[in-house]
Amino acid sequence: MGVTSVLLWKDSNGQGMMKFHERITTTLLGSAKDKWAIQVKLYRDIKSTGTDDVIVEAEREMENILEKLKNLWLLRQTIVYDGNTYIIGDFLIRVAYPKTTNSNYKGMLVEVEYTSTINPHVAAPILHEFIEMLKPPEIDIVKWEPDDEHSFSKIGLSEDAFTRAHTDYQYMMLFKMENLL
């Protein structure tokens, strides 16, 4: 695992995946690696009135645990994104559309991973430059970035070694920012 950056690629007409595939494979000479999917579930705490956010990374067994604790948690919404993984040098690019597009459709999820380091300070400028090269000028992207109020260290994550939990936190913040759930 390297350092990732999570983006929302604004795509109002739904043609982004074709354009993205063409740009990656033709213009940037990347190759399609395999299929990629991500499933996002939003649970609500039945008893709590607080607004604290919690990230839980778990395998399918977590659903069994939550089922046993169903009097504490309520599944509010599930969204499945399907797409592809591409590779260009030291970068893995994962892109996916929501399986069911509805009136709230806002674009594609894009996860760009720089695989040569786990240090976010080293990877940040490299990822920024690569993302700028990756996106066509007419496309808007939305990206959550840590700041003083919402930093990785404020939730107990390392500022020097990137993990899957860092990526999960980016997804959570992006989904909150863009009202994707």
Regions found by a protein language model. Give the residues of each.
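Polyanion/phosphate-binding surface patch
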Residues: 1-10, 18, 22-63, 92-96, ...
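Charged surface patches that recognize polyanionic ligands
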Residues: 47-88
